[in-house]
Design a protein with these regions (language model features):
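Alpha-helix termini
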Residues: 71, 104-106, 122
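Short microdomains enriched in Cys/His and/or Lys/Arg
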Residues: 111-124
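FNR/FR-type flavoprotein reductase catalytic core
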Residues: 1-89
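Short linear functional motifs in flexible/disordered or boundary regions
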Residues: 21, 50, 92, 106-107, ...
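Glycine-rich, flexible loop/turn motifs
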Residues: 34, 80, 102, 108, ...
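Local cysteine-cluster metal-coordination motifs and their immediate loop/turn environment
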Residues: 61, 85-110
Length: 124
């Protein structure tokens, strides 16, 4: 029913130099995008891997499956970015709430490329 940043998504959807693929688990009658698993759009996705970046935001368990699909499309690991959404309490790395492995999302992230993330224990 509600999608965050809907206005921005609509703006991106109409750009000629940008392709946006959105999917939701369960859609209502107002949704005009994909419905199902987040990996579903990869079934019909045709891309140029040398001109493609992937940006992931969601639960960490999802990242493993989406990265597998991106790799099937030959998207290089260094072009896959993921956001580690953690509760950032202090914002300066003192409280440890946002710590993932040896990294602090408030200082070192929250966005990491795959090469950085794969070595962070507990990230995916």
């Amino acid at each position: 029913q509600e999608v965050m940043f809907r206005n921005q998504f609509e703006m991106w959807r109409h750009r000629k130099d940008f392709d946006l693929y959105l999917t939701v688990d369960h859609a209502d009658e107002t949704w005009d995008g994909e419905e199902g698993l987040v990996t579903k759009p990869f079934e019909h996705l045709e891309i140029d891997p040398t001109n493609t970046f992937g940006a992931l935001c969601g639960p960490p368990i999802m990242y493993r499956f989406v990265v597998q699909e991106m790799r099937k499309k030959d998207i290089p690991y260094d072009r896959i970015y993921m956001s580690f959404e953690r509760h950032m309490k202090c914002g300066v790395g003192k409280c440890g709430h946002c710590q993932v492995g040896h990294q602090y999302c408030c200082i070192d992230g929250p966005v990491f490329n795959y090469w950085e993330a794969k070595n962070i224990q507990g990230s995916m």
